Amino acid sequence: MRRILVTGAGGRIGNYLRERLPRPDRALRLLDVGPQAPPAPGEPVEVLRADLTDAGAVAAACAGVDAVVHLAALRGEDTWENILRVNVDGTRTLLEAARIAGVPRVVLASSIHAAGFYRRAGAAPEPSGVPAPAGPDGVPSGSVPRPDSYYGWSKAAAESLGSLYADRFGMTVFALRIGACTTTPAAWNRDAWLSPDDCARLVDVCLTTDATGFRVLWGVSRNRDRWWSLAEGAAIGYDPVDDAEAYTAGMTPMDDAHAPTVGLLGGTFCTLPLGKPR
């Protein structure tokens, strides 16, 4: 029986994975700072409550697990101090605990906002004249970070920590630049949508692939309007099924509030005040 630690398990994505990741040879250890639903009869999960910045509690949570799915973080812009404490120091605490416990594999939840200032191919050129890096299948997942906010910077910092632990200690670390993971897409996030089922497919591939080392992958579905390449995910077996286009009929048109940043991957995050909690 393989045991997988999921941090931030009480959040939206954590709950999606709680429903979809368990299987006969896999059990989940669910860690969150807040309350979670207790295990249902026969559900192969263990529920823990602890703060990610509590090194002792995180070390205990990592003991005896085969892999970690690290979702715990502030989910949007916040003060610099909070961003550092939770998203950066918390990630370092988690990676160090995993290393000491001998956990060989970590899946980190990064974000498209780590690369939010990339432009859509065909959008107005940047003042610097730098073209959009999109290839025939979209922006490559290995594109260097261009964060759009303190939040986006913290996700880029988490990726860098993952790279450090992979190179220095031989761990396998996948950083997933996740788009908008919701049950159904909206007009404003249809290009970045990641369906719950595709999210589980991507995480499952990261947990089971023979690929090693450090990799950055885009966490998006097979959306017709996506900006991002799926080639790197395909190389390790990620084959998303869902497409936001299937929900077009139920969408309302994008409002004018999104127009100034429609050509930027990070959307409105690119213009929100830095350090102001959303």
What are the residue ranges of the model-derived segments?
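Glycine-rich NAD(P)-binding loop of the Rossmann-fold in SDR/ketoreductase-type enzymes
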Residues: 53, 82-93, 101, 149, ...
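Conserved active-site helix of classical SDR/Rossmann-fold NAD(P)-dependent CH-OH oxidoreductases
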Residues: 91-92, 156-163, 167, 200-201
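Conserved Rossmann-fold NAD(P)-dependent oxidoreductase catalytic core, especially the SDR/UDP-sugar
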Residues: 93-145
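Conserved beta-loop-beta element that borders a ligand/cofactor-binding pocket
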Residues: 110, 149, 159-184
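Alpha-helical substrate-binding/gating segment
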Residues: 167, 177-183, 193-214, 222
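Conserved C-terminal active-site "lid" loop/helix of NAD(P)H-dependent oxidoreductases
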Residues: 216, 222-239, 251-277
